[in-house]
UniProtKB/Swiss-Prot annotation:
Residues 92-216 form the B12-binding domain. Gene3D superfamilies: Cobalamin-binding domain (3.40.50.280), Methionine synthase domain (1.10.1240.10). It comes from Methanosarcina acetivorans (strain ATCC 35395 / DSM 2834 / JCM 12185 / C2A). This is Dimethylamine corrinoid protein 2. Acts as a methyl group carrier between MtbB and MtbA.
């Protein structure tokens, strides 16, 4: 019988391999000795973390990321189907995530959404080229704890500031945290516009979200 560490390693490796059948086999084996939350967080999400890192380094490409995310969803679905009726996995918080108006880049933001979801957050990904007011309207609708704002061009970064200003106008700024990211964004920019945090990559986005919303 494989040890827990070996099972978790295989779950992670299976995600990185982007092979759905391998992920499903690893989940089937792991669920005999582990709780679903542990399988997701320490196995599947760890693998997705690795995928995010490899993508950022140019070692994996978008099709790999999408296949890995699809494989992870298949694994999570198996675990959710086995939970007793009425059992709900506790969500760590509600996050609205999107790419600001004028910016059609989607890849990094999609990876962040996948990673946040796999870490246990309820994520509402509202896509790319999103008008400023839509972020705030969606945050109201779903009672969001945080808004994630991605901008991949210097010309669209201003949209991140505009969302924060609109949150203030709507009297929501105290309650809703704001995370910014994207190639031109920096910690200095986040400080300048009054964002709560800046995340350089998907793994950091998860860590910062936990830190801000859970104090972890």
């Amino acid at each position: 019988m494989a040890s827990k560490e070996e099972l978790l390693q295989e779950l992670s490796d299976a995600i990185v391999s982007c092979k759905k059948d391998r992920v499903i086999a690893a989940v089937e084996k792991a669920k005999e000795v582990m709780e679903p939350a542990e399988i997701i967080e320490k196995g599947l999400a760890a693998g997705m973390n690795q995928v995010g890192t490899l993508f950022e380094r140019g070692k994996l490409f978008l099709p790999h990321v999408m296949m890995a995310a699809d494989s992870m969803t298949a694994g999570v679905n198996i675990l959710e189907a086995e939970m007793p009726a009425g059992t709900e996995t506790k969500k760590l918080g509600v996050i609205v995530n999107g790419t600001v108006e004028g910016d059609v880049h989607d890849i990094g933001k999609s990876i962040v959404s996948t990673m946040l979801q796999s870490a246990g957050f309820e994520v509402h990904d509202i896509g790319r080229d999103v008008p400023i007011k839509n972020f705030v309207e969606k945050a109201k609708e779903v009672n969001a704890d945080m808004i994630g704002l991605s901008a991949l061009m210097t010309t669209t970064m201003q949209g991140q500031r505009d969302v924060i200003e609109l949150l203030k106008e709507e009297g929501m700024r105290e309650r809703v945290k704001v995370m910014v990211g994207g190639a031109p964004a920096t910690q200095a920019w986040a400080d300048k516009i009054g964002a709560d945090c800046y995340a350089e990559n998907a793994s950091e986005a998860v860590a910062k979200a936990k830190e801000l919303l859970l104090g972890k």
